[in-house]
Amino acid sequence: MNDVSKASLPKAIFLMGPTASGKTALAIELRKVLPVELISVDSALIYRGMDIGTAKPNADELKAAPHRLLDIRDPSQAYSAADFRRDALEQMAEITAAGRIPLLVGGTMLYFKALLEGLSPLPSADPEVRSRIEQQAAELGWEALHQQLQEIDPVAAARIHPNDPQRLSRALEVFFISGKTLTELTQTSGDALPYQVHQFAIAPASRELLHQRIELRFHQMLASGFEAEVRALFARGDLHTDLPSIRCVGYRQMWSYIEGEISYDEMVYRGVCATRQLAKRQMTWLRGWEGVRWLDSENPDRARKEVLQVVGAIAD
């Protein structure tokens, strides 16, 4: 697409960054001075009843700056990158039709990638998912997994022999990663985002600062009632650690503590470590991201001014 045709597209803003980098605070400030509406890009904030451990914006923040795509799933439900892309495009179209600019804020980089580039027909292999499938096969046999595929994707099951573990495993893996069947995905192709996107990433200047912020925020969550929040989820009886919601950083570690598998101190240590690892993965994504402008989270006023310099002209 050439620059002229790109300039005629509706505008959108991405505000990305690692966990605990101050994205939400900056987005709320930007909404005060720009004609923007916020869309959450976070695979944990979609879940109802998971507020403290996800650092979900509080009632006052949401009153000042409503976020779309919050609290749209029960923790027992799955939500894929394909689901997000569909929902986000719908919200962006609504916002644009109202004469405003979508501001997408969050740290789930896979969602940003899916939205920006479209979904590639098949997701990349996931060693963790593949390992779970192989473990299931060792316990139940490949014939049982073929029957499972028969229920999920009968078209693929008819094509794949029960004695072909590689193809059988891949078909199941694709479904578990994307929430879509192999048959569905091979019938579709990705479409690039039909918007002129201004992309920003906010992060502290050093890894040490980010680690300090992560540790501080984890302790703030604990002081705010995080344990009680997870105990309420645990008490439901229908949730478990195979669900994406309970595998969220912090929740998985608190769950292990509640089940008596680890001590409280070990839970805190593992929770902080897991959050740091998440931030590291997010930063790896962002360092390889094309066309992103970096903002310093330790200087929020300057970060706001830098966004306004770039975006202010498009808001006139």
Swiss-Prot record:
Q: Can you state which reaction this protein catalyses?
A: adenosine(37) in tRNA + dimethylallyl diphosphate = N(6)-dimethylallyladenosine(37) in tRNA + diphosphate
Extract the InterPro entries matched here: Dimethylallyltransferase, IPT, P-loop_NTPase
Record carries keyword Signal: no
| Positions with a binding annotation for ATP | 17-24
Q: Which UniProt key words apply to this protein? A: ATP-binding, Magnesium, Nucleotide-binding, Transferase, tRNA processing
For region Interaction with substrate tRNA, the annotated ranges are 42-45, 166-170, 247-252
Point out the annotated site residues (description: Interaction with substrate tRNA).
108, 130
**What cofactor does this protein call for?**
Mg(2+)
The cross-references to SUPFAM superfamilies, in alphabetical order and at most eight, read:
P-loop containing nucleoside triphosphate hydrolases
Q: What is its EC number?
A: 2.5.1.75
- Molecular function terms, GO-annotated: ATP binding; tRNA dimethylallyltransferase activity
Residues annotated as binding substrate: 19-24
Query: Can the keyword Cytoplasm be found in this entry's annotation?
Result: no
GO BP: any one term: tRNA modification
The entry sums up its family as follows: Belongs to the IPP transferase family.
Role noted for this protein: Catalyzes the transfer of a dimethylallyl group onto the adenine at position 37 in tRNAs that read codons beginning with uridine, leading to the formation of N6-(dimethylallyl)adenosine (i(6)A).
Assembly, per entry: Monomer.
What protein does this entry describe? Answer: tRNA dimethylallyltransferase
What is the scientific name of the source organism?
A: Salmonella newport (strain SL254)
Point out the gene that encodes the protein.
miaA
